[in-house]
């Protein structure tokens, strides 16, 4: 059994709860290969109040290079669509009807085997600040990472500057996850040496970031960055878990939470077994997972999240041909 968490979280004010309901990401979906491996089918998703869009999505199937999930499968790296069109997003009309306008799809591979595709969908909103970015390096043509595409809400100037930014290996959030081959959380961007665009970001309210690497068999590397703002957060908590030295449990590596600044102390002695809670399930299956309600997750991570007033989560494995390298979780 994992030890009891040492610290409880403070009371969450009603004003904060109201503010945090305006999330940057509106929908998260998981698509997995069918038994014959020819298509992608729906596994699970977080839709909030968009139950009608879920009903449209559940019966759908996507072939190789078909729709947003299928294009990420074919490409082998994250794909971002800033504007949905019927030619590239088969649910464009249904998405438009509920205010969804853009999205990103991130494939999960174990070696060359596709495990799943995680899709995040966003919508236009006059108040939305934040960013979801895809960066890329091709070593045959450059020593730097450049922006492939991104969604920035209303942060138009931040987007413009990003298009003219380049990151050498080991510099900035994209460059650091590229060099390490591991996910990374940057908290308190204003005082972080890891985030080179801190001044531009903090001026518009972006205060934390998550970077996830996507190495490719070609030797090219992509990086997905999620940049979260105070008022329209991508997530209220980010966590990274990694296998222990003995590979018999997952241990806490890094995290950042609005409502608990003592995550490292809380999790210092915590070990999550394979299959334990949502995080342990992701380790056991190699598949991303979503939870609409964390009340039933009795793992240390689940209990900590509930104590902080968090209700739902997305968890994604970062894998190679040998298995799990790290696990990234974000909570709402």
For each feature predicted by the language model, list its residue ranges.
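PAS-family sensory modules
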Residues: 1-27, 124-132, 229-238, 242
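Short loop/turn motifs at secondary-structure junctions and domain boundaries
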Residues: 22, 60-63, 94-100, 165-168, ...
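Short hydrophobic/aromatic beta-strand element in the GNAT-like acyltransferase core
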Residues: 27, 92, 105, 117, ...
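Short hydrophobic alpha-helical segments used for membrane anchoring or interfacial signaling
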Residues: 28-37, 133-141, 146-148, 239-247
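Regulatory sensory and allosteric helical modules in signal-transduction proteins
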Residues: 36-87, 142-150, 154-192, 249-252, ...
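A short, aliphatic-rich beta-strand micro-motif
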Residues: 101-109, 208-215, 312-319
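Flexible loop/coil segments at beta-strand boundaries within sensory signal-transduction domains
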Residues: 109-114, 125-126, 141, 215-220, ...
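Short beta-strand-to-loop transition segments that serve as allosteric relay/switch motifs
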Residues: 117-125, 223-231, 326-332
């Amino acid at each position: 059994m994992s030890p009891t968490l040492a610290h409880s979280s403070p009371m969450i004010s009603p004003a904060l709860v109201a503010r945090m309901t305006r999330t940057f990401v509106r929908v998260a979906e998981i698509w997995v290969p069918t038994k014959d491996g020819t298509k992608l089918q729906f596994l699970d998703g977080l839709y909030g109040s968009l139950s009608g869009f879920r009903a449209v999505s559940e019966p759908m199937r996507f072939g190789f290079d078909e729709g947003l999930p299928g294009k990420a499968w074919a490409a082998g790296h994250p794909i971002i669509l800033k504007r949905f069109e019927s030619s590239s997003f088969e649910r464009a009309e249904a998405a438009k009807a509920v205010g969804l306008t853009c999205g990103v799809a991130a494939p999960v591979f174990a070696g060359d085997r596709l495990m799943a595709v995680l899709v995040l969908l966003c919508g236009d909103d006059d108040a939305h600040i934040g960013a979801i970015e895809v960066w890329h390096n091709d070593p045959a043509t450059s020593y730097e990472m450049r922006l492939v595409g991104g969604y920035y809400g209303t942060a138009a100037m931040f987007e413009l500057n990003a298009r003219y930014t380049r990151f050498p290996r080991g510099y900035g959030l994209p460059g650091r996850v590229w060099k390490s081959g591991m996910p990374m959380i940057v908290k308190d961007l204003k005082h972080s040496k890891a985030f080179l665009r801190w001044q531009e970001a903090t001026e518009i309210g972006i205060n934390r970031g998550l970077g996830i690497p996507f190495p490719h068999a070609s030797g090219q590397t992509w990086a997905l960055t999620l940049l979260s703002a105070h008022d329209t957060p991508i997530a209220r908590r980010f966590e990274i878990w990694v296998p222990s030295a003995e590979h018999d449990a997952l241990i806490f590596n890094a995290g950042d939470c609005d409502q608990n600044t003592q995550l490292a102390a809380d999790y210092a002695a915590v070990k999550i077994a394979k299959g334990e809670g949502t995080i342990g399930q992701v380790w056991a299956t190699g598949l991303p997972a979503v939870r609409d309600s964390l009340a039933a997750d009795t793992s240390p991570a689940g209990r900590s999240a509930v104590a902080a007033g968090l209700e739902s989560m997305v968890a994604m494995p970062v894998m190679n041909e040998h298995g799990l390298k790290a696990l990234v979780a974000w909570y709402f």
